[in-house]
Amino acid sequence: MQTTQEWDKVFPLSKSVSHRKVEFRNQYGITLVGDLYSPKSGGNGMALAVCGPFGATKEQSSGLYAMKMAERGFITCAFDPSFTGESGGEPRRTASPDINTEDFLAAVDFLSTLDEVDEGRIGIIGICGWGGIALNAAAVDPRIKATVASTMYDMCRVNGNGYFDESDSEEARYAARKAMAAERTEAARSGRLTQGGGVVDPLPDDAPQFVKDYYDYYKTGRGYHPRSGNSNDGWHTFGTQAYSNARFLHYINEIRSAVLIMHGENAHSRYFGEDAYRYMLEGNAPGYDAVRKPNPVPGNKQLLIIPGASHCDLYDGGYTEPEGKGQAKNMIPWDKLEEFFKTNLENTIEQ
């Protein structure tokens, strides 16, 4: 993929932050492209890797998070995951639990090589579907000392069980598997992949409110970007199939490092975060088939519910009127994120 050097984000560049494009490889040999943000006043040795939402690009919400945290002294890298945006990998618009988790670990690898970064003080932020991926990465890699999952989805659960677990039956999963198998056969015969479509457009009048919220972010000037799958033609029709038959948060009850899960009070996705938090602490929660031991280090785990906020309000803070107009609602608790990371990245003692 060709990389643009022009500023093409959906938000303006902060005057207090320096920015440059970077590239690094994951263990599968895929080149990932990121935006590195650095405070002009000098960093504090702490670094954050940021990704999400699922199907978005670094020019959207993850870039905003990265830039805002750089304003607060962190070296940050917002990156496009494999098969997405400016990063490499074929076929395009494909997702994989293992490769996506590896993408986060590769970003940690990259940050640990920078002279201005203390390799023992690295954290991650995952937004939407990448919130769940961030938890999986934290369960795998103890180099990650602090994790924020913002407005998270559990992509395995939603692909396997449907929204609100309404398709959690063998019959429903079998029907979905048959449909996906037919798509694969057709793709094999034709030699072409069919894109499944991003956020629905035109928007039906009777669409659920959360779909309207997605439309307002991805399809209008508020958050539209030409490289974003959600803003355009989406994943290919079986591009997320690998998530439907996996359960990748099995070991989050063993995360010893600090975790903050934050959700809007009115988010349709709130149950993903609340159930993940409970399972992470207790080893038992709705949506999780296993019953496991309680977390060995529960004291550094937090759940934050933001009053009045929707799912997409935590993408960019939200606005009082559609299309990013009106007054900014400022729903993202930047001070809380700064306090959480500085507290937990300053304490580098192994838990």
Language-model regions, residue ranges each:
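The serine-hydrolase catalytic nucleophile loop
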Residues: 55-67, 81, 273
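Short beta-strand/loop motif that positions the catalytic acidic residue
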Residues: 255, 261-263
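Alpha/beta-hydrolase fold nucleophile elbow
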Residues: 116-128
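Alpha/beta-hydrolase-fold enzymes
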Residues: 135-220
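Catalytic active-site module of serine/aspartate enzymes centered on a nucleophile-bearing elbow/loop
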Residues: 309, 318-351
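Conserved alpha/beta-hydrolase
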Residues: 68-88
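Catalytic nucleophile-loop/oxyanion-hole region of alpha/beta-hydrolase
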Residues: 57-58, 84-119, 322-333
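N-terminal cap/lid segment of alpha/beta-hydrolase-fold proteins
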Residues: 2-42, 324-327
